[in-house]
A protein has these predicted regions:
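N-terminal small/glycine-rich loop or linker at the start of catalytic domains
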Residues: 40-67, 133-155
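Acidic, His- and aromatic-enriched active-site or binding-groove loops in soluble protein domains
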Residues: 113-120, 153-166
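Short, Lys/Arg-enriched N-terminal segments with co-localized hydrophobic residues
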Residues: 1-11
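Active-site cofactor/substrate anionic-group-binding motifs, chiefly glycine-
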Residues: 60-85
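N-terminal amphipathic alpha-helix/helix-capping segment at the start of soluble metabolic enzymes
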Residues: 12-57
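Short, well-ordered coil/turn segments that N-cap beta-strands
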Residues: 42-45, 86-88, 126-130
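Glycine-rich, proline-tolerant flexible connector loops at the mouths of alpha/beta enzymes
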Residues: 59-67, 89-114, 141
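Alpha-helix-loop-beta-strand connector modules within alpha/beta enzyme cores
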Residues: 103-134
Length: 166
């Protein structure tokens, strides 16, 4: 069977006219699958999940139609669907309350911040059925929105790294 498929692919791509008419290789779904260079499936995806404080919350994100922020208690449903579809990993992004932001991004070091609670919830409910990715960054936690500490509008790289490594 594999030899037959290889022969078909070879003739369809390397043959001379009239055998080499590439639209023939795209005419039917089965032939497109045979000659495709790559394929994309749920197992190739990472699901971004945007988190918000509170209980039983699902909030739309105006700038991204059909995308939502979820409270940690809603993760069971969201992550459960991802696991059933075969998505191997989620990426968590917090929407930090303005009251918890400061110029140093201190909330990033809180072991009970939104992302840490999300990680604990997913690990407890799903064990190793799905991977968890997080952005090691300060921008969700700083009052100025930059990904590093600022001094006179300049990022302080070394000082920022000190915080990020904690």
């Amino acid at each position: 069977y594999n030899t037959f498929v290889a022969l078909i692919k070879y003739n369809m791509i390397t043959g001379k006219y009239p055998s080499l008419r590439l639209r023939r290789s795209r005419k039917y779904a089965w032939s497109r699958r045979l000659v495709q260079e790559s394929s994309l499936s749920y197992s190739d995806l990472i699901l971004p999940i945007f988190l918000i404080e509170g209980k039983n919350k699902k909030e739309s994100i105006k700038s991204m139609p059909n995308i939502f922020r979820y409270s940690v208690d809603k993760l069971n449903s969201v992550v459960g669907k991802a696991v059933k579809k075969g998505i191997p990993m989620v990426a968590l992004f917090p929407h930090t309350n303005t009251k918890k932001k400061d110029e140093y991004g201190s909330e990033a070091l809180n072991p009970n911040n939104l992302v840490c609670r999300g990680i604990k919830f997913i690990k407890k409910k799903f064990k190793n059925k799905i991977g968890i990715m997080c952005d090691v960054a300060l921008d969700p936690y700083t009052s100025h929105g930059h990904d590093g500490l600022l001094k006179k509008r300049n990022i302080l790289n070394d000082e920022t790294l000190e915080i990020l490594t904690k």
